[in-house]
A protein has these predicted regions:
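Structural micro-motif
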Residues: 47-55
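Local sequence-structure signature of Cys/Sec-based thiol-disulfide redox active-site neighborhoods
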Residues: 1-25
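Non-catalytic, surface beta->alpha helical segment in thiol-disulfide oxidoreductase systems
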Residues: 56-83
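Glycine-rich phosphate-binding loops of nucleotide-dependent enzymes
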Residues: 85-87
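Thiol-based oxidoreductase modules, predominantly thioredoxin-like and allied folds used
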Residues: 30-42
Length: 87
């Protein structure tokens, strides 16, 4: 199961990122827990200078923009493939 964190204070872009993330999870059928992170200390611990940010399984995959649901779905597929190959 993936842990996906949407980082940001709850602004319009943060809400769009969360919606795109939920759509990507639905598109891929991935098992995922989506967590909204609004605590600035936690956000800054990832080294993110601008929000929104997206973290999948502890890895920052995007910040400062709103990636499309298609982009997010591709990142999820790549992570699943890498995990399967690592066995």
């Amino acid at each position: 199961m993936h842990v996906i964190e949407v980082l940001g204070p709850g602004c319009a872009n943060c809400q769009r990122l969360e919606a795109n993330t939920r759509s990507a999870v639905d598109m891929t059928g991935a098992q995922a827990q989506i967590v909204k992170v609004t605590d600035y200390a936690k956000i800054s611990s990832y080294g993110i200078m601008s929000t929104p940010g997206l973290v999948i399984d502890g890895e920052v995959v995007s910040f400062g923009r709103v990636p499309s649901s298609t982009d997010i779905a591709e990142w999820l597929r790549q992570m699943d493939l890498a995990a399967a190959q690592a066995g």
